[in-house]
Amino acid sequence: MFRNQYDGDATTWSPQGRLHQVEYALEAIKQGSATVGLVSKTHAVLVALKRNAEELSSYQKKLIRIDDHIGIAIAGLAPDARVLSNYMKQEALSSKTLFTRPIPVRRLMSKVAEKAQINTQEYGRRPYGVGFLVIGYDESGPHLLEFQPSGLVLEYLGTSMGSRSQSARTYIERNLDTFPDSSREELILSALRALRDTLSKDQELTEENVSISVIGKDEKYTLYDQNDTKEWLDKLGDKGPAAARASRAAAEEPQAPTAEAILDSADAMETD
């Protein structure tokens, strides 16, 4: 991906009007493990696939609580995520201290976007190599937003980021109309199904490699532990993409007519 003299700094434009350092930061997000976010009229959900650097190491933390009404899922460089998540926590605390109220979700993300965008304008800086999915609940209801290193923040009904995330987005696009009216349980299970589609053939969802969080009306940000995660995976049923595809194929396969159905059909064809 070497771009000659046009990728040496974030402030250097290419002749095609591109900032290659920003594009490289977006590529870092694609190297992270998949995360999925969904929102309904009452709740917002994040699920994430955790990785361990090697067999003997612990799994990397993917979901981070910012405040009682905000949480994030990260994809990309974990150290950059730590810097930005700490900044978000400070801003949330400042709002409570100065204004005695939780900071609105969009306002917090606007502050984070400004901080990230500065790194694309000043010489000697680099864009943050991490992206967020953000869920929150404030006076205007539940929210799901996506943050990108360029400083772009978009609001979604459902989305995914990270490695193999296109498979999850395909599932979300096919079922988008069902999410607004989904219950809390249905929304979590739908997010897990989308996450399951990002797995390779030899992988499956387990309580060790999956994180689940939810927020909603009269419900603070909740991050489930392994025991609770296992219960959700048991409700999901098929935990791997191969088994899920086999189940869907079996459900869609036309059934052979029974003997009673054949006899009924023959009787119906008789005429006087």
Curated annotation (Swiss-Prot):
Signal peptide: none annotated. Keywords: Cytoplasm, Nucleus, Proteasome. It comes from the Eukaryota. One of its GO terms (biological process) is proteasome-mediated ubiquitin-dependent protein catabolic process. Gene3D superfamilies: Glutamine Phosphoribosylpyrophosphate, subunit 1, domain 1 (3.60.20.10). CDD domains: proteasome_alpha_type_1. Its main location: cytoplasm. It is found in: Cytoplasm; Nucleus. One of its GO terms (cellular component) is cytosol. InterPro entries: Ntn_hydrolases_N, Proteasome_alpha, Proteasome_alpha-type, Proteasome_alpha1, Proteasome_asu_N, Proteasome_sua/b. The 26S proteasome consists of a 20S proteasome core and two 19S regulatory subunits. The 20S proteasome core is composed of 28 subunits that are arranged in four stacked rings, resulting in a barrel-shaped structure. The two end rings are each formed by seven alpha subunits, and the two central rings are each formed by seven beta subunits. The catalytic chamber with the active sites is on the inside of the barrel. Belongs to the peptidase T1A family. This is Probable proteasome subunit alpha type-6.
